[in-house]
Amino acid sequence: MFYAELFCQSNFSFLTGASHPEELIVQANFLGYHSLAITDECSLAGIVRAHSAIKQHQLSVKQIVGSFFKLNTECQFVLLCPNREAYAELCRIITNARRRCEKGQYQLSQWDVMSLKHCLLIWLPTGQTSDEQWATWLSRYQQSRLWLGLQRHLRHDDEHYLHHCQTLANQFDLPITACGGVLMHRPERLPLQHTLTAIRHGCTVEQLGTQLLTNAEQSLRSEKKLRKLFKPQWLAESLYIASLCSFDLDSLRYEYPSELIPDGYTPDSYLEHLVEQGKKLRFPEGVPDAIEQTIQKELALIKEQKYPFFFLTIHDIVMFAKQQGILYQGRGSAANSVVCYCLQITSVDPRQIAVLFERFISKERDEPPDIDVDFEHERREEVIQYIYQKYGRQRAALAATVISYRFKSAVRQVGKALGIEETQLDFFLKNINRRDRQAGWQAQLVELGLQPDSLKGQHFIQLVEEIIGFPRHLSQHVGGFVISSGPLYELVPVENAAMPERTIIQWDKDDLESLKLLKVDVLSLGMLTAIRKCFLSIEQHHQQRLSIADITRRQDDQAVYKMIQKADTIGVFQIESRAQMSMLPRLKPACYYDLVIQIAIVRPGPIQGDMVHPFLKRRDGEEPISYPSVHVQEVLERTLGVPIFQEQVIKLAMVAAGFSGGEADQLRRAMAAWKKNGHVFKFKTKLINGMLERGYELDFAERIFEQICGFGEYGFPESHSASFAVLAYCSAWLKHYYPAEFYTALLNSQPMGFYSPSQLVQDAKRHGIAVLPICVNFSNAEHQLVRLTSGELAIRLGFNLIKGLSHEGITRLLTHRPAQGYQCISEVKQILRQAKDIQSLASANAFYQLADNRYLARWQVMDNLDELPLFQTLPSISNNPLPKPSDYQNVLEDYAATGLSLAEHPVAMLEKAGGLTRFTRANQLNQCSHRSLVTVIGLVTGKQSPGTAAGVTFFTLEDDTGNINVVVWQATSRAQKQAYLTARLLMVKGILEREGDVIHVIAGRLIDLTEKLSGLSPKSREFH
């Protein structure tokens, strides 16, 4: 224990530090350091990760919390936290400095430094003549807590700098401490540090010149090297400073906001009061005894764990949403809580699922419960601003999300830093198949022409591998709020988000969980927006007011389930994906709980655990159902003896192996990370022995453990599925009974779901719904329903669909539109201020009432050409100098302007033009026999590569009659890589496979027909 490193920047000093906090703390422990201070620049974003690594690896090294600052280019220093007061002070200083600037910047003031009362200050002389001035100033205000930090990096001026620092220390009576200025945990990271510096400066490594580190001395160094560089007293001083720093992150305590409690109530009694009121609402005919017992058990544990404020906070937020007419739904493990149901946080009746409160709160786990609440995605901002207004920005902020380098950004940024041409990087990225899990991207790069033996090629691959996973910047969490009783900046630094009126803390959800700090998840869901808009449309056109509760009371509508069983579920929540639609005709959901199973079973967990086929066989009566005991039957009876849900695994561990609720939840957590650390295997002996002691066969015990491992990190909770099933049924019901309203609502709620507006419009047309084009005289901003002379409702497309049309342009167009409509294009031109707006309208053919075709409309848009000198010298021309666009050209223009076309489908159009060979259409596949050879052609509208599919990719092709499911095996994708990666219009020759009503085409040959489209097709949606 010879040394404490007091100045060390991790990769949370973005594009400066070249090692993760975890790597630094582990290496410091390996080298025998007494302490390590993670001191990122004006940031505490990396400290929790180092703290967690110490616990996980049981390290002896001590972590010191601190931060590095630049007051300006001439004054730099490190602040360290000796105690809790100093930590609060540091958080406040970082917050103030960050809040003064835009995201990613900070500005420290001299007053910030002068007002320090608790932090220890290590001044880092720059070697400039101004050092004496700064030493004078710092000594005047911080003499009692001030050290001079001496760094030695073996540069050409090292001896001069050493003498300079010693002179300053003697002159101002400053103790000297050794400092490393560490940027890397090992010297081998120097090339990566150079690369990060080049990225930061926007140049190549070769262009950095003197900005490059001259050596790897800014890594964690050995005792032998440090003793050569620093005097013993300077090393000893680092240990003395470390001895002053007793602050530990575990000492942080979260205090809940208290203003929600009315006079005369305690937090416990007020929660009980609200639950009592909720019981009357949720159970008007009386609370069943079993439910009442569960409520009392939950309330007792909530009180014991001191969580009433948490539940009251969530209740307050959802009540605000309810009062404002904002649809919401609690989900996740909260659906395991009857208290949450009574508080109207969740909508899943506990009598409909197997409630497992241990999944929600556990005494042994001793950490805050997790309640996710989804709000309409277009109105969630109202909820967020309510939280800010109620608690103030000093007490409420969003959690951070760490945006890290992923493959594409890593390749592009590293390549630029190494001087690789951007065209070559584009070529690499376009032609690397990341879905191919056997032929890694490294090997594919070599195939594409990268020279692996060249120095640049070796560096490129190594640097890309190293930088993937490195943090790039902090972004805002999708909705995780941290709300505190006192100023939040005394708990964690707060900074500005990129979005206006948003602030974020410097920790992400994993950091908060590690420190057992509470966050409230205020999430968004597009389907809730679509459902509300659908309800409003139904009320407008049918004078019927509906709610989600009204629809869920009709959960046994077999007409809806017949539609679901046919996989007619495009646009339906959670059961619209390719995999779900393939399963629906096999599982044939016929009730609400079937939907709960349907949503959960099409997940990697049940698939990897080999639970899907046994369940389907038992459901179809092809396999007997048996249980080794009554206790196991109680757990698995609803899923026919096959564990489908996480909760069932937990319950099995409890009833069959004697696990406590907390131990079983620890098993669940180990399941979630077993591939990373293998912790699940430490439960194997206890699980199997516990089952053997209770009379179960070894074969059964081992099979259960194998299924647990199969669940792995993909196990799906019944509570999640139950919440999702409510919206799945609701959206299916709306699609069945009010299809026009449903499709209009979906189109007006984009972006959301699996399908593009083009695909939704095609599906609406297949359901017999007329879709009308955008019209300057009849369209609104959003898509709307209009009644035809036949009495049927049709969808009129809205201006929001037009690319390049500004919001201001739409507003002016609608505000000034005469009652009788616009009579000529020049009238519109006088209203719209931006030329691009009127050009966009013409390109989208929105003037079809005022001009014969879009080409003529464009010409009229440019009718001021005669005023230009060049055109005044030309002879006059007719008013209609251009030929009409062909049908094919119109389709091209439609896609370019709006992303969809109401004209004939491109496949049908190309066939009529003789551009396609003979093929089978989507609606003809059901007439083909099993294992027959077929040829299909369609626009590539979707690709999915599930992590458990062993390299298989599922394509969705769309022709003029419907969608075609294509399975592409890995060998096929490798052999025909170009067509696989880039085709937008694809011909597939393959074998048709039929299983009941499920039809797939197993691809044999892929033929890229994209050139026939000439830019026609919409880009496919790809899901990994």
UniProtKB/Swiss-Prot annotation:
GO function term, MF aspect, one: nucleic acid binding
One term under GO cellular component: cytoplasm
Disulfide partners: none
Localization: Cytoplasm
Reactions it catalyzes: DNA(n) + a 2'-deoxyribonucleoside 5'-triphosphate = DNA(n+1) + diphosphate
UniProt keyword terms in alphabetical order: Cytoplasm, DNA damage, DNA repair, DNA replication, DNA-directed DNA polymerase, Nucleotidyltransferase, Transferase
Primary location group: cytoplasm
Pfam families referenced in this protein's UniProt entry, alphabetically: DNA_pol3_alpha, DNA_pol3_finger, HHH_6, PHP, tRNA_anti-codon
GO biological process, one term: DNA repair
SMART domains assigned: POLIIIAc
Record EC number: 2.7.7.7
Entry keyword Transmembrane helix: no
Highest rank taxon of the organism: Bacteria
The keyword Transit peptide is annotated on this UniProt entry: no
Job description of the protein: DNA polymerase involved in damage-induced mutagenesis and translesion synthesis (TLS). It is not the major replicative DNA polymerase.
Family membership: Belongs to the DNA polymerase type-C family. DnaE2 subfamily.
PANTHER family: DNA POLYMERASE III SUBUNIT ALPHA, ERROR-PRONE DNA POLYMERASE
Name of the protein in question: Error-prone DNA polymerase
Organism name: Vibrio vulnificus (strain CMCP6)
Gene: dnaE2
